[in-house]
């Protein structure tokens, strides 16, 4: 979404606009969709673990207004107490233009150079989201998106794994759970959902429909 207002407008409609229908045909979207399985496969080999590609959308039990779409989920990992743990793995293709928003030298893993040390935990740093994202070397948008997925799986950390379009190199960033940011996201989502519910008509049909053209 380009803005919160765009999100609210979409959630208050029960049809798809022409622009929304055309999103899937855009080259950048198709590229990401078609290369995603390759990136998942490569990261699975690196991790030595299966990376699942969920096909369903999930809703949080305690906060039903929060939904999750997972690009990838790392399987067969365990916490220190022996409990089973899923780890979110956000998957992206980065265009030549988008490369400027990433710092590969801060990646926990790069295909040509291998592994680096896991980064420090920045949750308690007295800085904003943009600064925290910069400490990891990733865009702020994907920092918050990954935190939401970490929240959805109740995970202690997550990965942002990308392929650079320029050289097809895989980079993966290890990102710790940031409960302060997660709390902010929950509050913002709650406020936004209240606006949506107040704007929707009483008989709103939750089923998304394609708008028909009668002209």
Language-model region placement:
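Accessory terminal regions of nucleic-acid processing enzymes
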Residues: 1-215
